[in-house]
């Protein structure tokens, strides 16, 4: 099975949760990216340490400090746009922790060509994989929904009547 091309998250505060997320990764990831939406320099140092922290499953760590909070959808779009050639993007809340095997299962589901979105649990958007063809067909997340909330439901409304195949829940769990 191939590695996850991109696993990204956005954060405004509480960087200790990102570290928990980081060390719960137990499956190969090519690019782990963090968009720091804090904009005040309060958590820059703690996040920069991720770039030098050893991790056997992560090939590249990218931390980008934004000058202001661009919002949830803005950060999600940056994850996608920063790795435009990826076949899919795993986007996760920063305070999620994966159980062993969760990312392997997500990668297996995302490898199915017909699947458009893989949700972690019950169709939720706290951790999901979005395929490249979904972005080509339905666009990016609406940044007018600022700073957060409803960007996920707005995106889902775009394809709900097209009967896009989705994986709504994985067998393996995660904590959030």
Named regions from a protein language model:
Residues 139-161, 165-175:
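Donor nucleotide-sugar recognition loop
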Residues 86-97:
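Short beta-strand-to-loop acidic/aromatic patch adjacent to the donor-nucleotide binding site
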Residues 26-64:
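Acidic donor-binding segment of Leloir-type glycosyltransferases
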Residues 96-127:
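Conserved donor NDP-sugar-binding/catalytic core segment of glycosyltransferases
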Residues 66-83:
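Glycine-rich, basic loop-to-helix element that forms the pyrophosphate-binding segment
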Residues 125-139:
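Conserved nucleotide-sugar donor-binding
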Residues 13-27:
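Short, well-formed alpha-helical segments that are part of the catalytic scaffolds
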Residues 22, 77, 86, 100-111, ...:
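Short alpha-helix within the catalytic core of nucleotide-sugar-dependent glycosyltransferases
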């Amino acid at each position: 099975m191939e590695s996850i091309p991109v696993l990204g998250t956005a954060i405004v505060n509480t960087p200790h949760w990102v570290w928990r997320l980081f060390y719960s990764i137990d499956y190969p990831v090519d690019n782990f990216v963090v968009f720091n939406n804090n904009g005040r320099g309060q958590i820059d140092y703690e996040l920069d340490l991720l770039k030098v922290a050893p991790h056997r499953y992560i090939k590249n760590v990218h931390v980008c400090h934004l000058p202001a909070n661009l919002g949830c959808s803005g950060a999600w779009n940056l994850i996608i746009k920063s790795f435009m050639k990826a076949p899919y993007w795993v986007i996760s809340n920063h305070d999620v922790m994966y159980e062993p095997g969760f990312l392997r299962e997500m990668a297996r589901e995302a490898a199915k060509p017909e699947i458009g979105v893989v949700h972690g649990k019950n169709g939720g958007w706290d951790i999901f994989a979005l395929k490249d063809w979904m972005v080509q067909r339905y666009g990016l997340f609406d940044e007018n929904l600022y700073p957060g909330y409803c960007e996920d439901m707005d995106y889902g409304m775009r394809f709900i009547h097209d009967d896009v195949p989705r994986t709504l829940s994985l067998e393996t769990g995660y904590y959030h």
